[in-house]
Amino acid sequence: MRTFEITEKEVAAAFREAESGEAKKILAALFCKEEMVKPTLDDYKTIRTYEDACKALGEPIFEDPNNLPNHIIALMKLETISRALWGRNFQPKPDGEGSKVYWYPWFALWTQKEVEDMNPEQRGALLSADANGGATAGFGSLHAYSRSSLAGADFGFRLCQETEEKAKYFGQQFIELWAEYLKFNFTVGNRLK
């Protein structure tokens, strides 16, 4: 087995010359400290924090002079991150004809065991039932009409992504922000602490 000696300067030059996002990821994984991978609108996986999203978009980091509620600040940050994850060329537009598919981020704030260990009042507040359009609340909402179940996406378009992969990344990479945005008066699962 041969050993190669590569200087940091050579790695930096190779990184600048790499044309594909995949090549840059490989170089970064092999040679770079995590901080050296700069956030870019060309590769959504370089957006790892809210600050990365601001940097990639060229926007200032939000400072709250008005003491807004934490869930509002979290939503504002999620919207910024969503725009950064869309990338440079993607401009989502609502599609009234339904010809486009957008993916809402998915994640789990509680494990199955944590839900099972909740008392009935906590579980009832977490998962609600529908009173025919009058009482949908909580994080999950159960519907029963002409079929045994119905799934619906009634809100949150600006947080959607154009691929399932990006939506999964958005939900899991930024799970703490999602928890802050959605938890209201709940304590989220222990694994997020």
Regions found by a protein language model. Name each.
Residues M1-K77:
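Charge-rich, low-complexity N-terminal segments
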Residues P65-Q122:
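Acidic, glycine-rich loop-and-strand cores that form catalytic or ligand-binding grooves
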